[in-house]
Amino acid sequence: DFPIANGERQSPVDIDTKAVVQDPA
């Protein structure tokens, strides 16, 4: 959960970071 990615204005970097964090499951 990043403040920049809070709401509909999500930065590509934040979205990519979340994907990477949830990837190693």
Curated annotation (Swiss-Prot):
Domain of life, per lineage: Bacteria
Domain Alpha-carbonic anhydrase: 1-25
Region (Disordered): 1-25
Cofactor(s) it depends on: Zn(2+)
Use in biotechnology or industry: Has a potential use in the concrete technology for the development of an inherent and more durable concrete material.
Lineage: Bacteria, Bacillati, Bacillota, Clostridia, Thermoanaerobacterales
Family stated for the protein in its record: Belongs to the alpha-carbonic anhydrase family.
This protein's name: Bioremediase
Described purpose of this protein according to its UniProt entry: Releases silica from silica-rich substances.
PROSITE patterns noted in UniProt: ALPHA_CA_2 (PS51144)
Disulfide bonds: none
